[in-house]
Curated annotation (Swiss-Prot):
Catalytic activity: adenosine(2503) in 23S rRNA + 2 reduced [2Fe-2S]-[ferredoxin] + 2 S-adenosyl-L-methionine = 2-methyladenosine(2503) in 23S rRNA + 5'-deoxyadenosine + L-methionine + 2 oxidized [2Fe-2S]-[ferredoxin] + S-adenosyl-L-homocysteine; adenosine(37) in tRNA + 2 reduced [2Fe-2S]-[ferredoxin] + 2 S-adenosyl-L-methionine = 2-methyladenosine(37) in tRNA + 5'-deoxyadenosine + L-methionine + 2 oxidized [2Fe-2S]-[ferredoxin] + S-adenosyl-L-homocysteine
General remark: Reaction proceeds by a ping-pong mechanism involving intermediate methylation of a conserved cysteine residue.
Gene3D superfamilies reported in the protein's UniProt record: 1.10.150.530, Aldolase class I
InterPro entries associated with the record: Aldolase_TIM, Elp3/MiaA/NifB-like_rSAM, Methyltransferase_A, RlmN_N, RNA_MTrfase_RlmN, rRNA_lsu_MTrfase_RlmN/Cfr, rSAM
Catalytic residues (positions): 119, 365
CDD domains: Radical_SAM
EC number, as in UniProt: 2.1.1.192
Protein name stated in the entry: Probable dual-specificity RNA methyltransferase RlmN
Cellular localisation: Cytoplasm
The gene coding this protein: rlmN
Compositionally biased region (Basic and acidic residues): 1-17
PANTHER family with a match to the protein in the record: 23S RRNA METHYLTRANSFERASE, RADICAL SAM CORE DOMAIN-CONTAINING PROTEIN
Top-level EC class as recorded in UniProt: transferase
Amino acid sequence: MEKNEISEERRTQEKEKQHGHRLNIRRLGRKELTELLTRLGEPAYRANQLHRWLYSNQALRFEEMSTLSKQLRQKLASEWIIHPASLVGTERETTDASLVTGNPTAKFLIKLEDNELVESVLIPSEERITACISSQIGCPLRCTFCATGHMGFRRNLTASEITDQVFLLEKEAQKRHWRGLTNIVFMGMGEPLLNLDNVLESIGTLTEKDYQFSISERKITISTVGLPVEMDRIARSGLKTKLAISLHSADQLIRERMMPIAADITLDKLAKAINSYNSVTSQPVTLVYMLLEGINDSPEDARKLVRFAKRVLCKINLIDYNSIVTLKFKPGCSSSKTMFIQQLLDAGLLVTVRKSQGATINAACGQLATRPVR
């Protein structure tokens, strides 16, 4: 979160307090919890205890927090409330394939404290159960093929609103599939790197080793259009998360038409940022490439992708376009897709093809939107 956003948030909090409103303590990050308890005359370790109650035990009342003194619990209850996000809607895939496997993708509508809505997706398979979570309400980048970009941008999610999505989907995974989440992907609504402070805070909570829910950093993937400064910050943070870059074209003009941000972050700048990330982390990135008929699926497009991919340490993940009724894009045809893949393989590149899941309930890549797409 930028400094001006933080100051605006604090001004809002002070204004609400002056009007006698109790604020949601889950708005506060770990650092802010420490500052709060210090102001209340408590030792710093109390913040860790409070954080554990909120995010490991997922307490809903301060009275439950037995490791805190009664006086502190009463003080907190007089000024704060505990208000996690809530599940308000579910849509489940009912295709023949999903019914046969018994692993239907499910999309969840989640209501936040201010009544804003966000979507998350549970993607089960035989090997894993993946939570696809959002980092923003809407998205300011306005990629032309993406439903989220067309719904506009409302605000960043707080760290707790991000973790709440995971907690809600973990409960649904246990209930529906009798096993918990194995992977988390930041591939829902929004650009995670535009909300990096809260994304990193949420990852810190979700990977806390002795919490009731804890997942390895290596099981988390952050997807981005490729913001160089923020990519460098992730690389130097020491995080072991995976990084996926939404490339979609290795032709500068085509990429600009698909993704307006590409006018500022050119392919040369992106390659430089990826090389820096590779150098710092010694890890490859995944280049995500969505095939669109007549736009980026020609043999020449494949040749350009080969040239770009050979400039960086990467693997390539090809995905089909998931149709959106109000947009005119079409997925690449099977014959052009086959030839495209073969060109990449012949060039010695590592290629995977992502099986689309959730398209029939608008839960697949690029389809999430809590407002109509115009």
